[in-house]
């Protein structure tokens, strides 16, 4: 059987880190939003005597021209798509021959959950083929692959807490014209979190984040987040912009350029270094993409996606 899946990127309209956990991970509070920038997956699978997974990879033209991410991509067993497929089949008790064709358009290691989106797409596709799990079971499986994979599986607009796997759908999706842009640098998530730990004293409570004032932890975060989105169409804050990383200088330059091109709000997404700008109209956003591309900077037009 052959299944086509769109693997949509996400942005963080709000992102705060609330605690460092005993297991070394961090608890977050984030408003995550699915956007139309996507990778494409075509997955074929049929039962076989033993499991074999093959991944073929194509880099999208814009990504190839501006972002130069191809060297960072693996088509081997360490690719998260292969990990997702193997996990699904092992838990389902199925041996299968799986073929995956991936067209990559989401920048890598950019805070856009490109790999997580691909993993979620693989899980959805395999479940359409084999139907081994309920939605709830598939969500539990996705959490084993990474903190952003559960949201990418569910999609839409949501308040995410815990490591990101605790998801509350906000039942409201702002209609936003978005430009996503990224320079040449990349930021590993581990490096970004280590920088935050240094600034916020391992989140022991002695140094407070501005995010707590914007979206306080009072048991009503979901209602507050929904109200903020409905009133302004945005709730922009990202604690990683306060991490002191040297890479933030390039981030700030792109944010400034987006503002010069008419963005009402700009923010780094995830642990960076991708940046998004919110524009009043699609025409303004298209113009910004054109000007950034002319300057040799990766930029892509996106819209919010409703689920």
Task: Write out the residue ranges for each language-model feature.
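Phosphate-handling active-site elements
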Residues: 89-101, 125-145, 282-294
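Residue-level signal for inorganic ion chemistry
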Residues: 13, 41-43, 81, 115, ...
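ATP-binding N-lobe of GHMP and related small-molecule kinases
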Residues: 1-110, 128-133, 173, 182-183
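Conserved glycine-rich beta-strand-loop-beta hairpin in the small C-terminal domain of fold type I
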Residues: 273-275
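Short beta-strands and strand-loop turn motifs
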Residues: 14, 103, 234-237, 268-271
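DPxDG-like acidic metal-binding loop motif
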Residues: 81, 110-138, 151
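Glycine/threonine-rich beta-strand-loop-alpha-helix active-site module
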Residues: 131-171
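Conserved, helical-rich catalytic subdomain that frames metal- and/or nucleotide-binding sites
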Residues: 154, 159-265, 280-293, 297-307
């Amino acid at each position: 059987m052959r299944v086509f899946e769109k693997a949509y990127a996400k942005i963080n309209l709000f992102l705060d880190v609330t605690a460092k956990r005993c297991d070394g991970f961090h608890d977050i509070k984030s408003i995550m939003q699915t956007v139309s920038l996507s990778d494409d997956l075509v997955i074929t699978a049929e039962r076989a005597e033993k499991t074999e997974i093959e991944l073929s990879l194509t880099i999208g033209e814009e990504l190839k021209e501006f972002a130069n991410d191809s060297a960072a991509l693996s088509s081997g067993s360490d690719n998260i798509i292969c990990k997702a497929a193997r996990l699904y089949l092992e838990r389902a008790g199925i041996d299968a021959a799986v073929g995956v064709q991936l067209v990559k358009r989401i920048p890598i290691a950019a805070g856009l959950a490109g790999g997580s989106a691909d993993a979620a797409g693989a899980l959805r596709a395999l479940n359409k083929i084999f139907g081994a799990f309920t939605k709830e079971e598939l969500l539990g499986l996705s959490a084993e692959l990474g903190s952003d994979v559960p949201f990418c599986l569910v999609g839409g607009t949501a308040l995410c807490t815990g490591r990101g796997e605790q998801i509350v759908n906000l039942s409201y999706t702002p209609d936003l014209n978005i430009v996503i842009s990224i320079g040449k640098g990349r930021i590993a998530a581990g490096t970004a979190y280590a920088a935050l730990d240094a600034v916020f004293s391992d989140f022991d409570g002695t140094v407070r984040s501005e995010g707590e004032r914007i979206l306080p932890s009072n048991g009503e975060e979901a209602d507050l987040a929904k109200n903020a989105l409905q009133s302004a169409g945005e709730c922009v804050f990202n604690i990683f912009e306060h991490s002191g990383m040297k890479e933030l200088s390039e981030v700030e330059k792109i944010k400034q350029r987006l503002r010069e091109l008419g963005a009402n709000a700009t923010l780094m997404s995830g642990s960076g270094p991708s940046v998004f700008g919110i524009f009043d109209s699609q025409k303004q956003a298209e113009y910004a993409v054109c000007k950034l591309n002319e300057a040799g900077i990766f930029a892509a037009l996106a819209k919010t996606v409703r689920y």
